[in-house]
C-alpha cells in the first residue's frame, strides 16, 4: 500500500495495491502487519482497531461531523465499497495550528482509497452517488454517552460537500450540532490521546 500525507499532520490517504487480471481484481483491504510497518512510524504510535462498521445511504445523505469525547476517543480508517462519497476530517484540537481546517477526499468503489482520521478530529461524509456502502474501522468501541459533533453545514469550515442544499438529507441529531464558533472542544493539541 502507498501512504499519502495530507496538509494536516496525521490525516492520511492510503492507496492499496491492486492485482488485476481478466477475472477482475484482488487486494488486501487491511493488514495489521502492514499498517503497523508503514503507518505507525508516520503517526509515531500504533493504532489497534477493534470495531468495524458499515452503513448504506442514498444520494444527498450527509453524516457528521462526529467524534467521541475522551476517554472514548476514536481513530477511524474509512472506505467506500459501493458508490461515491466525499469524506472529510476536521481538526478540532484546541491549540492546533490547523484547528478548524479540514481535509476532504473522494472515496469510490473504483479508486479503493482509504482515509485515516486520527483522534481529535471530527469526521463526516456526503453521498455523491445514487447509493453508497461505507465501511469504517474504529480503535475504540462505540459509547453513545460520549457522542459529540459539530454542524456538517457550518459554512465557516469552507467545505464544498458537492450536494445542493435542497438535496441534503441529515438525521435530526445531526441538524442539532453546534457551529464551530460555539463549540468548546474536549481535545487539546498538547494532550496525547494515544497514551
Model segments located where?
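Non-catalytic, conserved peripheral segments adjacent to functional cores
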Residues: 1-110, 131, 138-195
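Conserved metal-binding segment of the jelly-roll/cupin
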Residues: 107-131
Amino acid at each position: 500500500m502507498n501512504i499519502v500525507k495530507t496538509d494536516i499532520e496525521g490525516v492520511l490517504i492510503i492507496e492499496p495495491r491492486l492485482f488485476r487480471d481478466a477475472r477482475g481484481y484482488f487486494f488486501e483491504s487491511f493488514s495489521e502487519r502492514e499498517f503497523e510497518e508503514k503507518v505507525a512510524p508516520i503517526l509515531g504510535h500504533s493504532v489497534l482497531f477493534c470495531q468495524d462498521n458499515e452503513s448504506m445511504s442514498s444520494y444527498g445523505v450527509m453524516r457528521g461531523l462526529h467524534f467521541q469525547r475522551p476517554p472514548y476517543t476514536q481513530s477511524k480508517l474509512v472506505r467506500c465499497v459501493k458508490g461515491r462519497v466525499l469524506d472529510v476530517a476536521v481538526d478540532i484540537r484546541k491549540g492546533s495550528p490547523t484547528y478548524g481546517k479540514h481535509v476532504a477526499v473522494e472515496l469510490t468503489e473504483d479508486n479503493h482509497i482509504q482515509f485515516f482520521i486520527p483522534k481529535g478530529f471530527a469526521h463526516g461524509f456526503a453521498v455523491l452517488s445514487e447509493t453508497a456502502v461505507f465501511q469504517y474501522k474504529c480503535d475504540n468501541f462505540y459509547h453513545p454517552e460520549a457522542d459529540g459533533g459539530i454542524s456538517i453545514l457550518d459554512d465557516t469550515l469552507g467545505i464544498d460537500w458537492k450536494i445542493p442544499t435542497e438535496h441534503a438529507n441529515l438525521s435530526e441529531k445531526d441538524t442539532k450540532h453546534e457551529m464551530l464558533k460555539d463549540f468548546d472542544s474536549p481535545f487539546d493539541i498538547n494532550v496525547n490521546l494515544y497514551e
